[in-house]
Structure formats: C-alpha cells, structure tokens
C-alpha cells in the first residue's frame, strides 16, 4: 500500500500536550496528535512510523467540534479539530523533545 511520502509528512499537525495526554503517555504508552481532518487511521499510523521511527499498535481518532464564541456582536465558530490517540507497540518509546531536537539538526 504505497502511500505518498509528502502526504504522510503533512498528516500530523502537532502533538497535543495536556494533562490527559501526559497521563495517557505514562500509563498506556499512547501519544496524542492533532491531525488533518481528512486523515485516515492507516495514514496516521504510517506517518507516525515514518516520522518518529516507532512501531504503532493501534490508532483511535476523535473529531472535537469547534466551540461557538462571541466576537463583539457577532457569533463566530472555532474550527473542528481531529485528534489521534496513537498506541505504541510494547517496548516502544517516543520522546517528542528528542525527536524535535533531531529534526532541528537536519
């Protein structure tokens, strides 16, 4: 299943760093990422394996609806966000700080 390398590098937008994501990383070996809205689970799995060099056990996705916010008199709406919870295979470890430092050196 040959996926486009360029597409895979664009699928993952950013890691999500929150209290919940830190607990998941420590207890369940899961990483949380913000991904493109039209990204599929196989694409997300392939992208994480390509970019970080780790084995992925499974991917769970959830689309969070954007909140309605007021801007003065007008009502605006924040964008919907798709999150991917990526479970790493047993024995695999992903250090985002080290991965970011390695990417900066290239």
UniProtKB/Swiss-Prot annotation:
Q: Which organism is it from?
A: Neisseria meningitidis serogroup A / serotype 4A (strain DSM 15465 / Z2491)
Which Gene3D superfamilies did the record assign?
A: 3.30.70.330
Provide the protein name. Large ribosomal subunit protein uL23
Q: Which UniProt keywords apply?
A: Ribonucleoprotein, Ribosomal protein, RNA-binding, rRNA-binding
Instruction: Relate the assembly described in the record.
Output: Part of the 50S ribosomal subunit. Contacts protein L29, and trigger factor when it is bound to the ribosome.
| Family annotation (InterPro entries) | Nucleotide-bd_a/b_plait_sf, Ribosomal_uL23-like, Ribosomal_uL23/eL15/eS24_sf
- Provide the GO biological process annotations: translation
Family annotation (NCBIfam families): PRK05738.1-3, PRK05738.2-4
Q: Which residues constitute the signal peptide according to the record?
A: none
Q: Which family does it belong to?
A: Belongs to the universal ribosomal protein uL23 family.
Q: Its biological function? A: One of the early assembly proteins it binds 23S rRNA. One of the proteins that surrounds the polypeptide exit tunnel on the outside of the ribosome. Forms the main docking site for trigger factor binding to the ribosome.
Coiled-coil segments: none
Give the matching HAMAP family.
Ribosomal_uL23_B (MF_01369_B)
Q: Which Pfam families match?
A: Ribosomal_L23
- GO cellular component term of the entry, any: ribonucleoprotein complex
Chain ranges passing through the membrane:
none
Write one Gene Ontology MF term: structural constituent of ribosome
């Amino acid at each position: 299943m040959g996926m486009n390398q360029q597409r895979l590098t664009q699928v993952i937008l950013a890691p999500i760093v929150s209290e919940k994501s830190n607990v998941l990383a420590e207890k369940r070996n899961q990483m949380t990422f913000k991904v493109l809205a039209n990204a599929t689970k196989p694409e997300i799995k392939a992208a994480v394996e390509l970019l970080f060099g780790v084995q992925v056990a499974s991917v769970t996705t959830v689309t969070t609806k954007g909140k309605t916010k007021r801007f003065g008199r007008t009502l605006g709406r924040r964008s919907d966000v798709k999150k991917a919870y990526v479970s790493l295979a047993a024995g695999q470890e992903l250090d985002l700080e080290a991965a970011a430092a390695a990417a900066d050196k290239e």
